[in-house]
A protein has these predicted regions:
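Positively charged, amphipathic and often flexible ligand-engagement surfaces
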Residues: 1-408
Length: 408
């Protein structure tokens, strides 16, 4: 049975619910009021962002290997899109027939010849390889001077192409994923940490469909906390590596409609993870998921923060999505919770990763409005307003920021 009884709410919690699908223009006006924007702010932001972008581009241009390759094949180009589609898809396809079809679809249309210039060996080698691959899976051009060579290579067929592409894409994937396991990721982080970088680790995976799934994910999180805790070596939640937990992975019925089960079954599991994190003095973040799960995640956060056994632990973390129209009210609530608990809460501000599904779900459900901003620059504006709120509070939250946007 579903528990649809309304829970008593504080004024701040009520504001979160009331602004679930608030009119977008009203939200923007509120954000502008929070920001109190002026031309001096804009000038300074442009200067800092321009310097950051130029430094990153210079490093990419001077870089070797995959960095140079990604700089060459931009995501706005047909070739860049083809490479990213392969990187996203090829590793997930188990059968060779479908892999061949994917190669045919994504590679044969690219203008790889236009990228065979410059002095970067990796880019040129990749371009020539992709050029030949594109010809191999397309119709032969008898007028081409390279037709004979292509037909010769064609004798080997798509298995050679498939294996070569698989190797190349796996190599590219290693540039973006720290490791296939937490231990491999920790090993890969040793050198960057010596340069001053800090890491927060995510356990990639889907939501649990059964309790058996949840128990398996739970064991993975426990092992990960042990590994990260040992690597942390007493540096504390603020100065060492941390980890994020996806609540839908440790309980198959993580929803407001199942609140009683969430509190009686999921919370003890979550509490166990946080107590373990406290032993190692590492940060553990409750990761953000779909918008309809926000209230129940805040209920769990409040119960954790007010738990006597977790008193004084400054590694309790919560992720807030700036693309939600009620994000500023969530920040107000978390700050108030930290004050009530007399304990600092770690807050990580992100843009949000479920935009497509949030828009589609609202449309399918016939909602009058959306829970997220419909325009990217509105989300950017929300991010800045939320960041200002977070940085304006001393002693109650530890602010962390995640963004790919130099202006943010």
């Amino acid at each position: 049975m579903f528990n649809l009884a309304l829970q008593p709410q504080s004024e701040l919690k009520a504001q979160i619910s009331q602004n679930y699908r608030r009119n977008e223009q009203e939200c923007i006006q509120n954000l502008l009021t929070i920001l109190d924007w002026n031309s001096d702010h804009e000038t300074k932001i442009k200067q800092v962002a321009t310097n950051l972008i130029q430094k990153v581009r210079d490093n990419r241009i001077d870089g070797k290997g995959v960095d140079a390759l990604m700089q060459e094949f931009k995501l706005s180009s047909q070739e860049g899109i083809a490479l990213m589609c392969l990187a996203e898809s090829l590793l997930r396809i188990p059968d060779k027939y479908t892999q061949n079809k994917l190669i045919q679809d994504k590679i044969k249309t690219g203008d790889w010849r236009s990228h065979t210039y410059g002095d970067n060996f990796f880019v040129n080698a990749s371009s020539w390889g992709l050029l030949l691959t594109g010809k191999l899976v397309s119709a032969n051009d008898s007028a081409s001077l390279t037709a004979g060579l292509i037909r010769t290579i064609g004798k080997f067929g798509e298995p050679v192409i498939r294996k070569s592409m698989e190797t190349a894409v796996r190599f590219m994937g290693n540039q973006f994923v720290m490791g296939e396991s937490i231990d491999k990721a920790l090993k890969a982080s040793i050198a960057p940490e010596k340069q001053g970088y800090q890491f927060s680790y995510d356990m990639l995976g889907e939501a649990a469909l059964t309790d058996e799934d949840a128990q398996r994910y739970m064991e993975s999180y426990i092992n990960a906390i042990h590994s990260v805790g040992i690597a942390n070596n007493g540096r504390g939640a603020k100065n060492g590596p941390g980890i994020s937990v996806k609540l839908s992975a440790i309980h198959p019925r993580y929803s407001r409609a199942q609140r009683d089960r969430v509190m009686s079954e999921l919370f003890p599991r979550l509490r166990h993870l946080f107590l373990l994190a406290k032993q190692y003095k590492i940060a553990l973040f409750i990761d953000a998921e779909e918008t309809e799960r926000l209230e129940i995640s805040l209920d769990l956060l409040e119960k954790l923060v007010l738990d006597e056994d977790l008193a004084g632990f400054d590694g309790i973390g919560f992720v807030i999505q700036a693309y939600q129209r009620r994000a500023p009210f969530v920040i107000d609530y978390v700050i108030d919770l930290a004050k009530r608990a007399n304990n600092r809460i770690m807050v990580r501000l992100v843009k949000g990763a479920y935009w497509d599904s949030e828009i589609k779900r609202a449309q399918v459900d016939g909602q009058l409005d959306y829970p997220v901003y419909t325009r990217k620059f509105h989300t950017d504006l929300s991010y800045l307003a939320c960041a200002k709120k977070m940085l304006g509070v001393e002693g109650h939250i530890y602010a962390a920021f995640a963004t790919h946007n130099a202006y943010s």
